[in-house]
């Protein structure tokens, strides 16, 4: 009798363990399937950067500065389209999910570098912007107020607090990164970030929604070659840490730039020049944000 009880107990235990494994496996498959439906139908990468959506987004041409809406159902990016001879034009393209189908269409000619605000209500286009209307469409192009409407900005990003972080492109092909907070309901005069960030040529800032880190690209001493991607973390005293190079998995001797993070905080996107010095083939890559989190200082 005792042996039967022991055998029965072992059988129940094995059934329980197997059920747990099956449930865990199913959950993992469901999560993977859900993620693939979110990111333009792509399987998410690990710690090694991969071209994003080959053939759909990334081609043997020029694609740049992509970004998702908060619900991950719309992906906007810039594309260069060749015309007759050596002429070309730039377009703002969207890939959006409708009835579980991803469809690509041209939004407009390029009006600036797209950045979607954390709340999804505003699309910033460097010195311009569009607002999401009640019917879900984007408004007509509007100009930012002074002084932002006249600054030579390539990319403007904004935190959940509404703070602007943007670059200022200069005639000598150098650049600085500035910020502007909302004070008493108005944007303050733009201020330069510290000298550690504004060393060399610094462009294309991306501010975390909670302002806990700033990602940007810079060509400076100690890099891998051309422009590299760096991150600076905000310290407990409110100051910014010395910039950290994201390392050899992301940065190469080629030009890397225009980094951003998906609204869910899971993946880092960036650009890499895969062609010659003429930049005829610039691709969009993505990689797990864990590669960045590994650099975060331990408190």
Map each language-model feature to its residues:
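Sec-dependent signal peptide recognition
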Residues: 3-11
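Short, conserved micro-motifs composed of acidic
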Residues: 22-299
């Amino acid at each position: 009798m005792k042996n039967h009880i022991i055998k029965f107990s072992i059988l129940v235990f094995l059934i329980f363990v197997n059920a747990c494994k099956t449930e865990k496996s199913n959950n993992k498959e469901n999560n993977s399937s859900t993620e693939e439906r979110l990111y333009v139908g792509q399987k998410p990468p690990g710690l090694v950067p991969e071209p994003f959506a080959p053939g759909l987004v990334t081609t043997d041409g020029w694609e740049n500065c992509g970004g998702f809406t908060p619900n991950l159902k719309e992906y906007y990016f810039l594309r260069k389209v060749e015309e007759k001879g050596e002429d070309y034009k730039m377009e703002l393209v969207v890939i959006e999910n409708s009835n579980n189908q991803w469809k690509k269409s041209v939004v407009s000619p390029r009006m600036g570098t797209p950045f979607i605000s954390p709340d999804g209500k505003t699309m910033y286009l460097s010195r311009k912007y569009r607002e999401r209307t009640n019917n879900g469409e984007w408004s007509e192009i509007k100009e930012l107020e002074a002084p932002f409407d006249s600054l030579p900005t390539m990319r403007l990003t904004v935190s959940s607090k509404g703070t602007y972080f943007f670059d200022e492109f200069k005639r000598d092909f150098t650049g600085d990164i500035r910020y502007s907070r909302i004070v008493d309901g108005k944007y303050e005069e733009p201020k330069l970030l510290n000298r550690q960030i504004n060393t060399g040529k610094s462009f294309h800032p991306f501010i975390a929604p909670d302002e806990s880190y700033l990602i940007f690209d810079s060509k400076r001493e100690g890099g891998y070659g051309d422009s590299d991607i760096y991150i600076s973390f905000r310290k407990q005293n409110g100051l910014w840490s010395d910039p950290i190079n994201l390392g050899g998995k992301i940065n190469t001797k080629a030009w890397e730039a225009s980094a951003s993070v998906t609204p869910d905080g899971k993946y880092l996107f960036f650009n890499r020049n895969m062609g010659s010095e003429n930049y005829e083939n610039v691709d969009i890559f993505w990689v797990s944000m864990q590669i960045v989190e590994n650099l975060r200082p331990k408190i």
